[in-house]
């Protein structure tokens, strides 16, 4: 539960930024509020961005652009998303809780918060996505994921180059709608591979050694083993570190094999 003292609907991004800068410690940018309601918090000023048109999915200037207020369910249903990258973005979110939840949860909420359990950030990393911030401008998602959360900025959109790359996503869950125990995503463009692993349970990261194995033709199994050895894995209520390490080898191998099959088609 959370308590809000002042709830505002800015009409422009400039107004939203000005409101946020008044007090970045107690002001909060609202998304779908799916995760915010899980804790207990007093919010001095809640800034609702729903009137700013950030819920659009566009293809322009050679990029697929996902507004920060785009819902996860839109990723499953929008033709511009489902027809690209072998539908990886719709696939990666399809097991998250249920459709009513995915109709509320947003791209911005998942990406900006850098949740370790986020299926979406894992998939986006494999697609070489970038984020666009109001103050910080455009930067690679990998760089954004590695940085501390800055509550004085606003995420506007996520951009993915519409380059026709093939992609695949794999995850293991204790139940169908649970958070992932581990997740892996792989993409390939002109023989160059990108591999990412999420829910370690830390934030999703790129795995360069696994990508190198695929680039050098060492095969999917070698890539999986490289991912298991390069990255660190932790223990939480869903799984132990050793189990996650074993899962990484399997899921990276499976995603790589799936992507290889797609490349043959």
Question: Model-found features: residue ranges?
Answer:
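C-terminal structural segment of proteins
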Residues: 1-265
């Amino acid at each position: 539960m959370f308590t809000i003292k002042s709830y505002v609907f800015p009409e422009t991004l400039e107004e939203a930024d000005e409101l946020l800068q008044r007090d970045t410690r107690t002001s909060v940018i609202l998304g779908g509020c799916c995760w915010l309601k899980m804790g207990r918090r007093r919010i001095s000023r809640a800034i609702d961005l729903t009137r700013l048109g950030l819920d659009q999915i566009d293809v322009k200037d050679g990029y697929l652009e996902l507004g920060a207020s785009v819902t996860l369910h839109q990723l499953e249903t929008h033709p511009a998303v489902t027809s690209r990258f072998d539908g990886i973005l719709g696939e990666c979110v399809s097991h998250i809780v249920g459709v009513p939840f995915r109709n509320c949860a947003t791209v911005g909420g998942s990406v900006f918060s850098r949740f370790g359990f986020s299926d979406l950030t894992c998939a986006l990393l494999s697609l070489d996505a970038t984020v666009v911030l109001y103050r910080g401008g455009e930067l690679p998602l990998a760089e954004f994921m590695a940085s501390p959360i800055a509550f004085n900025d606003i995420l506007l959109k996520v951009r993915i180059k519409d380059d026709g790359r093939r992609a695949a996503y794999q995850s293991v869950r204790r139940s169908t709608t649970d958070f992932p125990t581990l997740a892996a995503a792989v993409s390939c463009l002109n023989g160059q591979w990108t591999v990412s692993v999420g829910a370690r349970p830390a934030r999703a990261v790129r795995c360069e050694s696994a990508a190198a194995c695929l680039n050098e033709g060492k095969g999917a199994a070698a890539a999986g083993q490289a991912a298991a050895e390069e990255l660190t894995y932790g223990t939480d209520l869903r799984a132990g570190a050793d189990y996650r390490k074993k899962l990484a080898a399997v899921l990276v191998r499976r995603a790589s094999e799936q992507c290889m099959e797609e490349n043959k088609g």
